[in-house]
């Protein structure tokens, strides 16, 4: 009787257990699968990297880029994890590479011609699928690059010598505009005005207010640098980037006015050949329906801001290095006298200025301005044995690479580092391959002409033994001196031409 009473209870218990076990098993299996997924995610690659930690790692790495700046964060991670390592930006895998063979591979292949950055950030500054610098639409990028390459080579390259020399001479003749009460020269402002004037004369040809436009270019660059890697939720709060949005609008509106004047000059020109230049070519392409008006405006804007943004700072660093190394200055001045003498500089002088060229290269190696390159993988690949998936972001830390391999004295500033030919895989200040800097040849001409004209007229010194090594800098999208710290002026001492050129 008792057994019969317990029998139904037995069946109820076994029924309950049979119902609970599947649910418990499913829960355990799901949890195990989730943990295995996380474990596998962290170990899908042998590439050195910080831990994933349930998604906390990617948040920390992205925050570090926003906090330290792109360049400083890259140096930090390469120092911590090696010359080929992985982090996350915006939740996307990002490789930071400073190994020459890997850098060479990425630059060489066409499936790395795309760049990466925040879509709303690029839209805000007008670079999303427009212009050339961060245009990631392959078809549009190729279309506009043709116009840039044409303007930056051939006749434009030949004309640059005279145009740049005239601009430098004009600005040196009115040096008092950039001198302070102590007689010190604001070299950054001087160089920015020279580079803007030269670019305008060669590529747009419309009179502009140099002082005002240079300030607006700096505001635009600050916005570009600040917004490039910001996460999407940042742009949901317009007050967070109101200042940058206004800076972008300010420059674009001023550029639109200048470009509209250019359109009018084309219409009223008696001969179209008389006003043919970069801007005219783009405007005619717009009329043919090949480019949109917005893209044309962005291309012209980018052409005009490129030199004031980078070359001006590059020459600024060069002059500080010359001031610290008088033996280098002596060698440069001696070569100027030997090659050019008292006559005007000519295009055929460019290839003969070997000391000047080596000085430029060593300056760009030792104290770079653009020390990183941002790319995105457009297809699966393998780099130096590491698998790279399509869509992976890549930052080439070329500034660090230039101090790691090949050079006999990598941590010193010395022309000995270029006494012998340097294989281009070890030195890439302008990049190479399908997305190399379109203006690398014309940039070399501008720097050579600037140094020759300036050093023929002035000896440069720094107050109180200031130097680039002690200078406060910001290493973000590019490496710039911290202009809020001051102490960036130089002393220009007029040369006695007879004595200086026989120096």
From Swiss-Prot:
GO CC annotation, single: membrane
GO biological process: female gonad development; response to estradiol
Single GO molecular function: heme binding
Classification via PROSITE patterns: CYTOCHROME_P450 (PS00086)
UniProt subcellular location: Membrane
EC numbers on record: 1.14.14.14
Family per record: Belongs to the cytochrome P450 family.
Protein name per the record: Aromatase 2
UniProt organism field: Sus scrofa (Pig)
Protein's gene: CYP19A2
């Amino acid at each position: 009787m008792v057994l019969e009473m317990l029998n139904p209870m037995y069946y109820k218990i076994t029924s309950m257990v049979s119902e609970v076990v599947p649910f418990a098993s499913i829960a355990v299996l799901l949890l195990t699968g989730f943990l295995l997924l996380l474990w596998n995610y962290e170990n899908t690659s042998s590439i050195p990297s910080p831990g994933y930690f349930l998604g906390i790692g990617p948040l920390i790495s992205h925050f570090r880029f926003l906090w330290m700046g792109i360049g400083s964060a890259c140096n930090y991670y390469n120092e911590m994890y090696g010359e080929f390592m992985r982090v996350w930006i915006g939740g996307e895998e990002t490789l930071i590479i400073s190994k020459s063979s890997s850098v060479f591979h990425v630059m060489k292949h066409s499936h790395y011609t795309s760049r990466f950055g925040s879509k709303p950030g690029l839209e805000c500054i007008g670079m999303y699928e427009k212009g050339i610098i961060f245009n990631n639409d392959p078809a549009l990028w190729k279309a506009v690059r043709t116009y840039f390459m044409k303007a930056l080579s051939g006749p434009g390259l030949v004309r640059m010598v005279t145009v740049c020399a005239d601009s430098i001479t004009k600005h040196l003749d009115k040096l008092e505009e950039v001198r302070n009460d102590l007689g010190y020269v604001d070299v950054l402002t001087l160089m920015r005005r020279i580079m803007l004037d030269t670019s305008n004369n060669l590529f747009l040809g419309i009179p502009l207010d140099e002082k005002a436009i240079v300030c607006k270019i700096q505001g635009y660059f600050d916005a570009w640098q600040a917004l490039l890697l910001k996460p999407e939720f940042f742009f949901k709060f317009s007050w967070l980037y109101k200042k940058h949005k206004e800076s972008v609008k300010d420059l674009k509106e001023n550029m639109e006015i200048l470009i509209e004047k250019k359109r009018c000059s084309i219409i009223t020109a008696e001969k179209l050949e008389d006003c043919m230049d970069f801007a005219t070519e783009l405007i005619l392409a717009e009329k043919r329906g090949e480019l949109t008006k917005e893209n044309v405006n962005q291309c012209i804007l980018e052409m005009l801001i490129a030199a004031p943004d980078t070359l001006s700072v590059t020459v600024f660093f060069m002059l500080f290095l010359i001031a610290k190394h008088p033996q280098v200055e002596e060698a440069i001045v001696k070569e100027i006298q030997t090659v050019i003498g008292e006559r005007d500089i000519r295009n055929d002088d460019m290839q003969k200025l070997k000391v000047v060229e080596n000085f430029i290269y060593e300056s760009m190696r030792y104290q770079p301005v653009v020390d990183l390159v941002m790319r995105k993988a457009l297809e699966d690949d393998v780099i130096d044995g590491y698998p790279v998936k399509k869509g992976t972001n890549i930052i080439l830390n070329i500034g660090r690479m230039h101090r790691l391999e090949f050079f006999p004295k990598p941590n010193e500033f010395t022309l000995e580092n270029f006494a012998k030919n340097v294989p281009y895989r070890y030195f890439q200040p302008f990049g190479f391959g399908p997305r190399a800097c379109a203006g690398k040849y014309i940039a070399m001409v501008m720097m050579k002409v600037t140094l020759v004209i300036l050093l023929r007229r002035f000896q440069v010194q720094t107050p109180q033994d200031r130097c680039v090594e002690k200078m406060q800098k910001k290493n973000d999208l590019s490496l710039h001196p911290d202009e809020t710290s001051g102490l960036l002026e130089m002393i220009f001492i007029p040369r006695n031409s007879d004595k200086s050129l026989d120096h």
